[in-house]
Amino acid sequence: MFQDNPLLAQLKQQLHTQTPRVEGVVKGTEKGFGFLEVDGQKSYFIPPPQMKKVMHGDRIIATLHTDKDREIAEPETLVEPFLSRFVGRVQRKDDRLSIVPDHPLLRDAIQCRPVRELTHSFQNGDWAVAEMCRHPLKGDRAFQADLTAFITNGEDHFVPWWVTLARHNLEREAPAMVESALNDAELEREDLTALNFVTIDSASTEDMDDALFVQDNGDGSWLLTIAIADPTAYVVENSELDLTARKRAFTNYLPGFNIPMLPRDLSDNLCSLRPNERRPVLVCRVTITEEGTLSNDIRFSAAWVESKAKLVYDDVSDWLEGNNRWQPQDTAIAEQITLLKRICDARSNWRQQHALVFKDRPDYRFLLGEKGEVLDIIVEHRRIANRIVEECMIAANVCAALALREHLGFGIYNVHTGFDPALVEQAASVLKANGVGADPQALLTLPGFCELRRHLDALPTQFLDSRIRRFQTFAEISTVPGPHFGLGLEAYATWTSPIRKYGDMVNHRLLKAIITGQQAEKPQEEITVQLAERRRLNRMAERDVGDWLYARYLQPQAGTDTRFTAEIIDITRGGLRVRLLDNGAVAFIPAPFIHAVRDEVVCSQETGTVQIKGETVYSQSDKIEVRIAEVRMETRNVIARPVA
């Protein structure tokens, strides 16, 4: 009798309209209940029964109700699900399949079934890619997912690599080789095969894309010739190989191995500047003065070169430092190394005075066994040979930036604008509070930024430097010239790694247009978007595999008395993030591990300090001693505790 009652319908509509609603993001907990966070300011409790309708990370609209003086959120409408495509581990029970997402706050198994095209018979512990297809807030009875791809079985030793690549939807293998002949008839190449070019790389490097040759001019200056491998001689624009390289955008370097942008036949053979092999290259010649200034005689050309020696960073560094365990093969190579060292010193001095030089940070290299186990982690400090190559490549990239700007007005540029204009006032306030006077407007200029960086680099600690980093913008990829504040340079365009970076291949084609006097087309903006997105995904993949391997490596140390020296890299409300200096692992120290009485300890991201009873006990960039308290393998988190 009530179902068609207009008064009842009107009353329901009124109640619906009058019920307060909020939109926010669900935050799950390990205890079954959750919270709806609204604008990062306010949160509402979601009881366990209501949490069964949603997932951590879902953006929803919820109705608000009061229960025993507490405001409770009841999920009503799904705005945007947290999970769409994801990876997880399959559970098989009585021929029924479910999948647990590989995420620290998603512990519940989701019912699932393979899509029709997938023929793999899933077993307990298998890793898979899944797509959510049902959600309770969409009117479905329960969550459900489709299994769309089998990744690997649970016993595979290389799970960290395969799962991470699948998570980020990245390729597992090198691209297939397509028949590819040298294709540059319109390009005249000069023969430089008689010159004593050398490559300097790691011992294991196969994709060598730069070779160097120096001529002493006898007046204190040098003529530096940088030869860069020329894959665009084999890869025609918009060909199958080119489209593959454009999609991949970069060679993906992961612990233990890489997945190249180009087929290995090209990257490790035909284009690689192997010793005593004739190779097509693009060449940049520039005179460098005794003071390290790049002269304005920059010239690009196409050439043939033949590297006379594959040198290794550590060998060259040892020899230059007076350790004679290794010797150059002849006096000509010895002379090249000596001249390159002089250029490096001159350019480094020039950049310290007129641009910016990054502080040296060590690289950490995983030494892996045949089954992917971590045998050791090697700390590789940047040595003189690394700096030689770095200075020559920076010089070459500055030359390309200037040439592209002058002749075309476009290219693939690396741009960094320093401080975010919206945050520069805050940066100036933090600097002032720490005794450094700074004019916000001056900080937005390249000279002002460089002056500040030099001042910060001269301070005894990294505290202030780390405090103001959050007010800076990220480096971007642009098709038009712009400054690179991080390097302290007016313009910067890379072309020195075309085997492993698609943006460098684009710049090669533009430089060839300048060399031949042909028309060049400005790169599409979509290319910069693809490059930026792939760079982000590759970095996340490298970090994720690293976290997994660090967890495996440090698990035996959990609960032991082994001490590690660590640097505080971030302070959050919940505790400290530290980097272990012996191996590069990042660990978290919860605030209760710092001081037992929670109300007496304040961890402040704003001030970059930890205070106990008002006294500062830790600051960002401090070095402290820690022990490993726990390693959570399911989330790959390392939990540390300060040594009292």
From Swiss-Prot:
GO terms for cellular component: cytosol. InterPro entries: CSD (IPR011129), NA-bd_OB-fold (IPR012340), RNase_B_OB_dom (IPR013223), RNase_II (IPR011804), RNase_II/R (IPR001900), RNase_II/R_CS (IPR022966), RNase_II/RNase_R (IPR004476), RNR_Ribonuclease (IPR050180). It is an enzyme of class 3 (hydrolase). One of its GO terms (biological process) is mRNA catabolic process. GO terms for molecular function: exoribonuclease II activity; RNA binding. Transmembrane segments: none annotated. It comes from the Bacteria. Keywords: Cytoplasm, Exonuclease, Hydrolase, Nuclease, RNA-binding. Residues 561-643 form the S1 motif domain. It is found in: Cytoplasm. Residues 189-516 form the RNB domain. Belongs to the RNR ribonuclease family. RNase II subfamily. Involved in mRNA degradation. Hydrolyzes single-stranded polyribonucleotides processively in the 3' to 5' direction. PANTHER family: EXORIBONUCLEASE 2, RIBONUCLEASE. This is Exoribonuclease 2. The gene is rnb.
